[in-house]
């Protein structure tokens, strides 16, 4: 991903997250850092999102194992509940899609193996409500 395109996608996603009530920041040095830093991290309630951000005109994008591993390693530094996320802006459909990886491995992210970012927000909201209502 071109560096400027990547920055713009990250900024757009931070704006979307903030619009949904998250505290979200972009970490501009994440790729070059030896530390396990995601492109973006966001918090809301007791949930921490560690996000690898991509943007493509293609119908798929490959995310390398070391990028996915950084998401898990970043989350392991915190005691709060964390979710690793790969967020991809598929430009041909003008839509952000997300995938929650289960382990650190090379992953090919497609429109078909992801959910919309709106669906992610619904899942997270439901999860928060269940935690509040469960004694």
UniProtKB/Swiss-Prot annotation:
Mg(2+) binds at residues 10, 39, 52. One of its GO terms (molecular function) is DNA binding. Disruption phenotype: Not essential, it can be disrupted. More sensitive to DNA damaging agents hydroxyurea, cisplatin, and methyl methanesulfonate than wild-type. Double hjc-hje deletion mutants cannot be made. It comes from the Archaea. Pfam families: Hjc. Coiled coil: none annotated. GO terms for biological process: DNA recombination; DNA repair. Keywords: DNA damage, DNA recombination, DNA repair, DNA-binding, Endonuclease, Hydrolase, Magnesium, Metal-binding, Nuclease. It is an enzyme of class 3 (hydrolase). The keyword ATP-binding does not apply. The record marks 54 as: Transition state stabilizer. Gene3D superfamilies: 3.40.1350.10. InterPro entries: Hjc, Hjc_arc, Restrct_endonuc-II-like, tRNA_endonuc-like_dom_sf. It catalyses: Endonucleolytic cleavage at a junction such as a reciprocal single-stranded crossover between two homologous DNA duplexes (Holliday junction). Its cofactor is Mg(2+). Its EC number is 3.1.21.10. A second Holliday junction resolving enzyme, Hjc, probably with different substrate specificity exists in this organism. NCBIfam families: Hol_resolv_Hjc. Homodimer. A structure-specific endonuclease that resolves Holliday junction (HJ) intermediates during genetic recombination. Acts only on 4-way DNA junctions in a sequence non-specific manner; introduces paired nicks in opposing strands 2 bases 3' of the point of strand exchange only on continuous strands of 4-way junction DNA. Cleaves both mobile and immobile junctions. Plays a more direct role in DNA repair than Hjc. Overexpression of this protein decreases the growth rate, and leads to genomic instability, and global transcriptomic changes. Belongs to the Holliday junction resolvase Hjc family. Hje subfamily. This is Crossover junction endodeoxyribonuclease Hje.
């Amino acid at each position: 991903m071109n560096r400027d395109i990547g920055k713009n996608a990250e900024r757009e996603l931070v704006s979307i997250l903030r619009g949904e009530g998250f505290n979200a920041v972009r970490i501009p040095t994440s790729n070059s850092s030896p530390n396990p830093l995601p492109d973006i991290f966001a918090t809301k309630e007791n949930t921490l999102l560690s996000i690898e951000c991509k943007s493509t005109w293609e119908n798929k994008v490959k995310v390398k194992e070391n990028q996915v591993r950084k998401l898990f390693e970043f989350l392991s530094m915190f005691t709060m509940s964390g979710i690793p996320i790969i967020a991809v802006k598929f430009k041909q459909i003008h839509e952000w899609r997300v995938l929650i990886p289960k382990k650190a491995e090379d992953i090919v992210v497609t429109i078909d193996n992801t959910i919309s970012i709106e669906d992610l927000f619904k899942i997270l909201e439901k999860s928060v409500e269940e935690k509040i209502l469960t004694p």
